[in-house]
């Protein structure tokens, strides 16, 4: 019976490239010359830390980061910016990366599939949702339906089996 999995995964090497490209752009921009501006990725805790001298610069760096995410085809819904905090003369903003389906979001997705009226079977299996049906066309309808919905994080469809 045909099936596929719904997951939300981040490719950390692509995120790393986006952060590195943002760092290079910071070094070449005239308005950041002589300023204490940095951006760094912590892959273990899945956080990006922006440190600048003002709120405005922090917003500028975040905008540059979003731009590089778009260029690398990483969905910006994966970014969860926290409130910027002032510490000493620097403003620090932590951006958490959303990776994996949490149980609440998985339940919302499962409920949306059930309420859509499309006759498929879906079940939550850890950090993914398995969707099965007898016809491939029905599974493709589910994919189209889910692409139109907003769940606050990027969804990928993988492990498609006939």
Swiss-Prot record:
Gene Ontology cellular component list: cytosol
NCBIfam families: PRK05412.1
Chain's role: Nucleotide-binding protein.
Keywords: Nucleotide-binding
GO molecular function: nucleotide binding
Cystine bridges: none
Protein source organism: Acinetobacter baylyi (strain ATCC 33305 / BD413 / ADP1)
A family per Pfam: DUF520
Xref: SUPFAM superfamilies: YajQ-like
Name of this chain's protein: Nucleotide-binding protein ACIAD3137
